[in-house]
Amino acid sequence: MMNKTDLRNLTQDEITEYVVGLGQPAFRGRQLMSWLYRPGITQFAEMTDLAKDFRKLLAEHARLSRFEDPILERSSDGCVKFGFGLDDGRMIETVLIPEPDRNTLCVSSQVGCAMNCSFCLTATMGFIRNLQPAEIVNQVCAVDDFLRSQPEEERIGPEKVTNVVFMGMGEPLNNLENLLKALSILTEQRGLDLTNRRITVSTCGIVPKMRLLGENSDANLAISLHAIDDATRSKLMPINERYPLDELLAACRDFPMPKRKRIMFEYILLKGINDSEAAARELARKLRDIPCKINLLPYNESPGIPYQSTPMRQILAFQKILMDANYSVFIRNSRGTDISAACGQLAKKEEANQQNPTP
């Protein structure tokens, strides 16, 4: 089975190329793509408008991967954390954040992470491997299946995923090739048909790859900033040693995007570390010429991580300074904390400390 081509790893262009390689006309590629992500389709025999001989050929040479029997943890606030088993026995986590008008899915792009951010529980896993495009896309497919299976009276939001944020396990830009393929499938009309404005890719600042993302995708960009001076940021995020703040912010100014779009800067507030009024004023100064909005994140404390949350009154004071400087500033409502599903809390315990080299 494993030597068969997993069609969910392929973009529309690659599907067409694959079909032609099987001796079929190119239009079969469009037909096939329109079936791969339909609800409930698990076998080629179910693709009823494809020629019978073509379906048989596909069954011999290809497969449709999917996640089955996820481990579910439900939060008291409605969030659901999914644990998905991969073919090699590894596990990844994905979080559904439902609201009445939308379902946001926080997806993973790697097993573990090499960035070693000192406030993030995923860092304790080390980097294990990149996810394939199918392993990224199948997180969305599996949660769509879950939502459709729920009685209407039990659903908080719509019956499918409407928004995708790459803020789960891993640094998305360190898996750029597979990320771009996954984004193509997610936004393909014959694929999952999401709009780019509802997809956000968050990075800790892999500067050389930021422009490549902007040139090859219209997804929204979020920057995990978390400090506004190099000494503090390098302590929190070792990647800052390689790409210091001035270089990162220059890349943000140079990021290709439509005039109406803005970069989202994410800023975790850590008690006594980066939450002073002086830090807020410096943040306002440094972001002055970048089209942006700012998302303030109350820190979600985790066992073994030596940081504390900033009191809400201080977060509000920090926000006011930024708003007085004419920034759009939001305070993220932490959800899923009771099941370790909030920002920075995703990590499979059995994977912890299995360190591999940086990809």
Predicted feature descriptions by range:
Residues 1-92, 98, 151-152, 253-262, ...:
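Auxiliary Fe-S-binding modules of radical SAM enzymes
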Residues 98-145, 149:
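Canonical Radical SAM [4Fe-4S] cluster-binding loop centered on the CxxxCxxC motif
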Residues 144-154, 159-325:
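Conserved AdoMet/S-adenosylmethionine-binding subsite of the radical SAM
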